[in-house]
Each structure stands twice: as structure tokens, then as C-alpha cells.
Swiss-Prot record:
Residues 832-897 form the HTH luxR-type domain. ATP binds at residues 39-46. Activated by ATP and maltotriose, which are both required for DNA binding. Disulfide bonds: none annotated. GO terms for molecular function: ATP binding; DNA binding; DNA-binding transcription factor activity. This is HTH-type transcriptional regulator MalT. The gene is malT. The keyword Cell membrane does not apply. It comes from Yersinia pestis.
């Protein structure tokens, strides 16, 4: 819950001086990116902007306190202020901020600006007391904010110090409206107005001017003069002499003498006790002071001018002026030192009763009351955890003495989950083992349910570490004892079980477990796990060869991301990457490339090492197009990321795929041999991850002419793929087997492997996997088409593959271009008939397409001409070549290509 007073405009006080000369300057605020009110405490910064804001619509106000140095808290309140200003226009940004589903503050602000791009009219955001921010990450994000905010948005910052926001650059570019101490100091006219409002006996103009000069227009000093002059035996002139030359850091003695000592003991105790609160309402005042009429007392003190401000129009929330608040807290520590822990304890109870555990934690920490801190955590820690309040939880758990933490095993479990969520994976088991040992030594009982929750977390750690057997045992044992009410641990254990089956190649068992995980996670709003389960389902379906079903599952995942605003999570990149893989398989290369590029964009706010697999996909897209130079650029980027980084074998396998294909296309045996000497050779190949690594190895062995070794590898891969029903892997393996057989002149076995690959492709939809094999694949497909040896579906796919090879690779159509024809006609062995009666350029193109296996209609579509025109071209070229039918034309084209060294 957000504290309403932090988002409320301060109420405009009745007896304040209207700063007309400054309001005129502020009237042009909409013309600037930043309006900065920068001066020491007590010069009326907040009051001035409150006066100006009273006439503004579409304005959000955010009052900072020390706790706002947590980036997540800062983001949540800032977006909430924008939402109040826009009437809820930025709902997506609000959801992201509340669930902490963004990579960093800059990424969140980028989404905010996207939503504000269609906001019409001026928009203002006021951030008060910015000097309290000491977090460099927030400063950096606000510099990003100022660079990229929409033109119609003005940021207004109130600060005692010059904020680290690139102010000089804004000033040079005339994008800064700045008001400082000299402008905010009262002039003589304003001082006269002030005293007329505050004193029962008016001062002469000359007297008020002298008083103003003596305190250099410092508003707080004038307020203190007015307050002191109400006391017996005091005068405005005496007060001014005491205040002359003082500043905010030397006021304590004066405030004691002239303010605190002048109120009765009851009011003094009331002020000091209330000072522990950063903001207060009647319920909190009752908790701290025992006064049932606390709000009336506040209103009375406000009338006396005691630096108390209303924070909202409903007059429910109050706060002290920052200068007075600092003074009161210092006096409270001095005068009520023994009572102070009790006051913070009462404040914590008050905030808990209002439903603000984060504020309660602040006071429990201030009180040093670890028992209360423990009680708050036991009641609210998991809610804070699921709302990603990780920094706050870490602060709490650090403050708890370890013996107290282990006396409450659920907090020890929370500490381990916190490490897991902060990606400190190596610490998780250590924390759990340390806690279990401490509990055992202290004879603290741990029931079966809690032990099962420990086991579920350990299972997650084990599967992350690549230990599926250990993970399976831990997850299975956990599920035996976890009741349905402990849904989070059950979701984790079920997910791990499904992932174990996936890793073992037991896809038929893995899929329903992941479907069950998704259902449970959706039911209990654990959307991160629901998304993870959908990603796993998609990968399983791809491995089973059901790419269309995988595509549809991905659509569900995209919908979940949109609904729950998960766009900035790394799992979104995972989804885009596997979408790219499916599209690449279907030779929808433009879409595949777009998905991979979006994945890279998602990861722009994370470590660049995470971009490895998307860059590898972009390399594969270039390879499928035959663009080797562009592919090499991406491959080099992948190699640079891999250098000096530690990656899981799955990542390395995917990054190596385009490398080995590139070596095959370029004949780079040196690089291939070097890689083969160094690459990891897994002990098994019983899942699609390991199949991919061994397939890379087999391809390199073929490149190097080590055919016997490659055949052993491929035979085992095919056997495992058939046994485990890894249909997509079998499809890929058979294509590599085809390459092996073709290069070793075993044409019958090559044809058999190719036909089975085409049959499997009816299920997988594979196109690009065939295309990257290039000319050898094209020759075999043409032969199968000419022999009419394929069923209709396979025939259609073969023609589509040929078309893509012709379009993207070194192919027959390209060979019959003008340069090729010029060389052909000057070749000494060219047939005399062709030399004396050369074909036109269009006829050469048609011959190339006939040789590539295209039908007349397909040639017409390819060249975008009428079918009758194609028949005319064919009749003419037959006559010029001296052939009678299509088969003879293909043979003649084959002879010409052989003569030129292309086949």
C-alpha cells in the first residue's frame, strides 16, 4: 500500500504570502524540461510550488523521505504520482512498477514515455525534498528521465542542494527554469505582507524592511520572529537581532528558547513524541501520545504557527516542516532517549494497524526491536517477497540476530529464497545447510511440511546446477508432504519435476507436468512460473516435432506477458528466441530475424552476455539467406561474448551451431579442427540439448573428412532420437546423415535419409534445415523431383526448399546470369549450336528454373509473367538447345554447369 500523504499536494495555507513575482516566473514552466527550486531549508520552496500548483491540472506530487532511496519504492511512488496526474493513463507502467517487473528504472521510464506519447496537453510532476536521494542508481535514472521525457512533461524538483542531474547541460540548452535562494528570499513588500498576516499589532514599513534585511529575507526567520513576538517581554526587533546571521544549521538553541520552551509541557511532550513520525494522522497520534483529540491539538498548534503542514485536502494527514521536524527529532533523542524505543514500537504498531508493513518495519528497525521485526516478518514477509520487496527484506533479515532467525525456520527459508531470487545461487544451499545445522544444535523442531519446503527450494537449485537426478528426488519427496495450501512450494516442485523429465528426454511425462505447473501458477497468480511453464511446454513440443502446437503455446505466452506486463523480464527474450527458432525452421526469415532483434532489445538493460543466443539466431538467419559476411559479423560478436564468460552447455551449443555451419559453407577446416579439439563431448545424448552438441561435433567431423567417426555419432544420435521420440532432432540428424552419405558416394543411403527427412518435415515443417545444406541438397531434390519419387506433400516441400536454395544460395538460377553466360559463350568447349544461336537472358533464366525442378506455373510465378509467355520461352530454348523435352533440357543444363565447374 502507498501512503496517500506522500502523493498529495500540500494544502495552500490561508495566511501565507502569495509570491506573485515568483508565480509569474513559474507561469512559463511548461516551456522547460526541468524547473528547479534549489535553496536551503526554510525559504518556502514547498509553499511556493503549492501556490502555483493550485491553479494547475494534470499535476502529480511526490514528497520524498529517506526510505525513498530504495529504487523500487522510488519507482512505485513516481509512477503513482504520474497516474494521479493523468487520471490513470499509464496503467501498464503502473502495473510494472507495482510488481517490480522491469529491468531497471530507465527501462521502466521508457515504458512510461511510450504511454505518455499519446497524452495531449501539459503535464507536471513535482518531486519534493530531492536532496534526500543519495542512491546513484536513482540519479542516473532521473538523468535518463530528463533526456527522454516527452516535450509536454515538465519535471519540477525541490531540493536543498544542487541535484546530480546534468543541470549544467540543461542550463546551456535553455531547458532549465531555476529559482534559488536569492529569488526565494522575501523582499520588503513580501515581509510587510507577512507581518500583517501574523502580528496583532502591525509594524511600520521601515521596521519590517529592517527586519527583513537583518535576516536576509529568510522566511523561516521571519516566521520565528512573528512567533517569538507573541511571547511576553519579547519583540520582533529582539528576535531579529538573535536571528541575524543564523542559518538552518544554527537554529537549535533559538528554537528551544523561543518555540519549545514557550509551549506548555503537554504540548511539548506531544510535539516530541509525534516527531518520530514522517507523516501522521489521528490514529497514529493516538498510538504515540495517548491523546484522543490528537488531530485537534495538531490543528491548534498549526494555528499558532508551529511549522505544521496539512498534507491533503481532507486534512487527515499532517507533517512538520522539514526544518522543524529535524530539530524535533534531535530534541526527542535528547529529552526522550529512554522512551524513544517505545515510541518507535508504538509507531510500528500504528502503521501495522493501518496496513503499511514497510513503514512499520522502518520503526521496528529504528527501535532496535528485533522481536517486533520478527513478528512483522512472520506476518508479512512472504507478501513482501511476492511483491519483489527484496532490498527491504534483505535489510530486515540482516538486522535479525541469527539465533532469532533460525528459531523461526520459515524465516531461514525466506533468507534462502531471497538469495535465489537475487541470483546468488551459490549461496542458497549453504544458507539452508547452515540453518538446518543451527536448528539441529538448538533442537528446534522442523515439521515435515517445512522440510518439504526446504526440499522444493533445493530441487530448484539442483536443476539450475544441472543435477537432474538430485533435483528429481528432492522435488518428488517435497510433493509427498506439501499440502495444497503451500501452493508456492508445490508450484516449484512440480515445475522442477517437469524440467527433470524434459532434461532426461522423457517428453511425454514432462509436458503434462508443465501444463499442471502452468495451471497452478495461474490459479495462484504466480505468473513468472506460469510463463516459465509455457516456455518449457513450447520447447517440449518443438522437440516432439509439433512446431505448430509450440507456436500456439507461444501465443498463449505472449498473451500472458501482455496481460501481466512481463515485457521487461529476461523470460520475454527466451520466448522471442524460441519463436525465432520456429520461424527460422519454417523459413520465415524476416519474422525470425525480427523476433531475435526484439530479444536483443529486451536484454539491452541486462548484461550483454545474455544476448548470446539471440545473436546466434541472427547469424543463422543470415546463413539461411546465404549472406556469409553478415553471418560472420554476428558469429564474431558471439565469440567475443563467449571469451572469458562462463555459459551453460545449452547456450554454448546454440552459439556454436551457426559457427559450424559457417565453417561448412566456407570450407574452414582449420577453425573446425581447433574447435573440435576443445569442445565438450557429453557422455550422453538423451535429450535435445545434448543431441544438438553432438550434432555440431558430427558436422565438424564431416567437414574434416572424418566420416567414420561422424557415422558412429550419427547412428547413436538417431537411435536415441527414435527411442525417445525426439522427432525434430531425428529430422535434423537424418539431414546430416544424408550429407555424410552423399559425400561418401553412398547415394542410395543418402536418398533414403533424405526421403525420411522430407516425410518428418510434414510434421515439423522444416525448410531452412534443408536449405543450409546448399547445392548438394539442391541436386538431390532435383533428382527426386525428376524421378517423381516423392508423394505429393513431400514433392511440394522439395520444390519449396529448392526455391529457397535458388533464392539464397549458389544455385542454378544465379549461374545463368549475364556474367555466367558471357563466360559460357567464350568457353572453348561450348556447343556450336549455343554459340551460333544464343539464348536470350530470359530464356537462360527459364532454363535455370527448369533445371531447379520448377513447373511451368511455378516459373511463371517466379518471373511474374503469364504461363503462355513461359511456354513460348520454353519452346524457343528447346529449339536453340536442340532438345525435345524437359528431361533433355535438364541434362543439357547439367552438362553446361559441369563444363563451367559448377557441379
Amino acid at each position: 500500500m502507498l501512503i496517500p500523504s506522500k502523493l498529495s499536494r500540500p494544502v495552500r495555507l490561508q495566511n501565507t504570502v502569495v509570491r506573485d513575482r515568483l508565480l509569474v516566473k513559474l507561469s512559463s514552466a511548461a516551456n522547460y524540461r526541468l524547473t528547479l527550486i534549489n535553496c536551503p531549508a526554510g525559504y518556502g520552496k514547498t509553499t511556493l510550488i503549492a501556490q502555483w500548483a493550485a491553479d494547475q491540472s494534470n499535476l502529480g506530487w511526490y514528497s520524498l523521505d529517506e526510505s525513498d532511496n530504495q529504487s523500487e519504492r522510488f519507482a512505485t511512488y513516481l509512477i503513482a504520482a504520474i497516474q494521479l496526474a493523468t487520471g490513470g493513463h499509464c496503467s501498464k507502467s503502473e502495473a510494472l512498477s507495482q510488481k517490480h517487473q522491469y529491468a531497471n528504472l530507465s527501462a521502466l521510464f521508457s515504458q512510461l514515455f511510450i504511454e505518455l506519447s499519446n497524452w495531449d496537453g501539459p503535464l507536471y510532476l513535482v518531486i519534493d525534498d530531492y536532496h534526500l536521494i543519495t542512491n546513484d542508481a536513482i540519479h542516473e535514472a532521473m538523468r535518463f528521465f530528463l533526456r527522454h521525457q516527452p516535450e509536454n512533461l515538465t519535471l519540477i524538483i525541490l531540493s536543498r542542494t544542487l541535484p546530480s542531474l546534468g543541470i549544467a547541460n540543461l542550463r546551456v540548452r535553455d531547458q532549465l527554469l531555476e529559482l534559488g535562494m536569492q529569488q526565494l528570499a522575501f523582499n520588503h513588500h513580501e515581509a510587510q505582507q507577512f507581518f500583517e498576516c501574523r502580528l496583532s499589532s502591525p509594524l511600520e514599513q521601515g521596521d519590517s524592511s529592517r527586519l527583513c534585511d537583518e535576516v536576509e529575507g529568510w522566511v523561516t526567520a521571519l516566521q520565528l520572529i512573528a512567533l517569538s513576538s507573541r511571547q511576553p517581554n519579547s519583540s520582533a526587533q529582539k528576535s531579529a537581532k538573535r536571528l541575524a546571521g543564523l542559518n538552518a544549521s544554527h537554529l537549535s538553541d533559538y528554537l528551544v528558547d523561543e518555540v519549545l520552551d514557550q509551549v506548555d509541557s503537554k504540548a511539548r511532550a506531544f510535539l516530541l513524541r509525534c516527531s518520530v513520525l514522517r507523516s501522521m494522522n489521528d490514529a497514529l497520534i493516538v498510538r504515540l501520545t495517548g491523546e484522543d483529540n490528537g488531530q485537534q491539538l495538531l490543528e491548534e498548534l498549526e494555528r499558532q504557527g508551529l511549522f505544521i503542514h496539512r498534507m491533503d485536502d481532507s486534512a487527515e494527514w499532517f507533517c512538520f516542516h522539514p526544518l522543524f521536524a529535524t530539530f524535533l527529532r534531535q530534541r526527542c533523542q535528547w529529552e526522550l532517549a529512554l522512551e524513544l524505543p517505545e515510541l518507535h514500537h508504538a509507531a510500528a504498531e500504528g502503521w501495522m494497524a493501518l496496513g503499511y508493513p514497510a513503514e512499520a518495519i522502518h520503526h521496528a528497525l529504528a527501535a532496535g526491536d528485533v522481536g517486533m521485526l520478527r513478528d512483522i516478518l512472520l506476518q508479512h514477509a512472504w507478501s513482501l517477497f511476492h511483491h519483489s520487496e527484496l532490498a527491504l527484506l534483505e535489510q530486515c533479515l540482516t538486522a535479525l540476530p541469527y539465533p532469532l532467525l533460525v528459531q523461526n525456520p520459515e524465516l531461514a527459508l525466506l533468507q534462502a529464497w531471497l538469495a535465489q531470487s537475487q541470483h546468488r545461487y551459490s549461496e542458497v544451499n549453504t544458507l539452508l545447510e547452515q540453518a538446518e545445522l543451527a536448528m539441529q544444535e538448538r533442537k528446534i523442531p522442523v515439521d515435515e511440511i517445512l522440510r518439504a519446503e526446504f526440499g522444493a527450494l533445493r530441487a530448484q537449485v539442483a536443476i539450475n546446477a544441472g543435477k537432474p537426478d538430485e533435483a528429481e528426488k528432492l522435488a518428488t519427496d517435497a510433493l509427498k508432504y506439501l499440502p495444497m495450501a503451500h501452493y508456492y512450494s508445490r508450484i516449484v516442485a512440480t515445475s522442477v519435476t517437469g524440467e527433470v523429465h524434459h532434461c532426461k528426454g522423457e517428453l511425454a511425462r514432462a509436458l503434462p507436468m508443465m501444463q499442471q505447473t502452468e495451471q497452478m501458477a495461474r490459479r495462484h497468480e504466480a505468473y513468472h512460473y506460469a510463463l516459465w511453464a509455457l516456455l518449457q511446454q513450447s520447447e517440449i513440443l518443438i522437440a516432439q516435432g509439433f512446431l505448430q502446437a509450440a507456436y500456439e503455446t507461444q501465443e498463449k505466452a505472449f498473451e500472458l506477458i501482455r496481460e501481466q506486463h512481463l515485457e521487461q523480464l529476461p523470460m520475454h527474450e527466451f520466448l522471442l528466441r524460441i519463436r525465432s527458432q520456429v520461424l527460422w525452421s519454417w523459413s520465415r526469415l524476416d519474422e525470425a530475424e525480427e523476433a531475435a532483434r526484439k530479444g536483443v532489445e529486451i536484454l539491452a538493460n541486462y548484461q550483454p552476455q545474455q544476448q548470446l543466443q539471440c545473436l546466434a539466431m541472427l547469424a543463422k538467419c543470415s546463413l539461411a539467406r546465404g549472406d556469409l559476411d553478415n553471418a560472420n559479423v554476428y558469429i564474431q560478436r558471439c565469440e567475443a561474448l563467449q571469451h572469458g564468460s562462463q555459459y551453460h552447455l545449452d547456450w554454448i551449443t546454440n552459439a556454436d551451431k551457426p559457427r559450424v555451419i559457417h565453417w561448412q559453407m566456407t570450407g574452414d577446416k582449420v577453425a573446425a579442427a581447433s574447435w573440435l579439439r576443445q569442445t565438450e563431448k557429453p557422455g550422453m545424448a538423451d535429450n535435445h540439448f545434448l543431441q544438438g552438441q553432438w550434432r555440431n561435433i558430427a558436422r565438424v567431423q564431416i567437414i574434416l573428412g572424418r566420416f567414420d567417426e561422424a557415422e558412429v555419432v550419427l547412428d547413436e544420435l538417431n537411435e536415441n532420437a527414435r527411442r525417445l521420440r525426439l522427432t525434430s532432432d531425428l529430422n535434423r540428424n537424418l539431414l546430416l546423415s544424408n550429407t555424410l552419405y552423399w559425400q561418401t558416394e553412398r547415394k542410395g543411403e543418402a536418398q533414403k535419409a533424405l526421403i525420411e527427412s522430407l516425410t518428418l518435415a510434414n510434421r515439423t515443417g522444416f525448410i531452412s534445415h534443408f536449405v543450409i545444406e546448399g547445392e548438394a541438397m539442391a541436386q538431390q531434390l532435383r533428382q527426386l523431383i525428376q524421378l517423381n519419387a516423392l508423394p505429393e506433400l513431400e514433392q511440394h516441400r522439395a520444390q519449396r526448399i529448392l526455391k529457397d536454395i535458388n533464392q539464397h544460395h549458389r544455385h542454378k538460377f544465379a549461374h545463368f546470369d549475364e556474367i555466367f553466360v558471357d563466360k559460357l559463350l567464350t568457353h572453348p568447349q561450348v556447343p556450336e549450336l549455343i554459340r551460333t544461336s544464343p539464348l536470350t537472358q530470359r530464356e537462360w533464366q527459364v532454363l535455370g528454373l527448369i533445371y531447379s525442378g520448377y513447373s511451368n506455373d511455378q516459373i511463371a510465378n517466379e518471373l511474374d509473367v503469364a504461363a503462355t509467355t513461359i511456354k513460348t520461352h520454353i519452346r524457343n530454348l528447346y529449339q536453340k538447345l536442340g532438345v525435345a523435352h524437359r528431361q533433355e533440357a535438364v541434362q543439357q543444363a547439367q552438362r553446361l554447369l559441369q563444363m563451367m565447374g559448377y557441379v
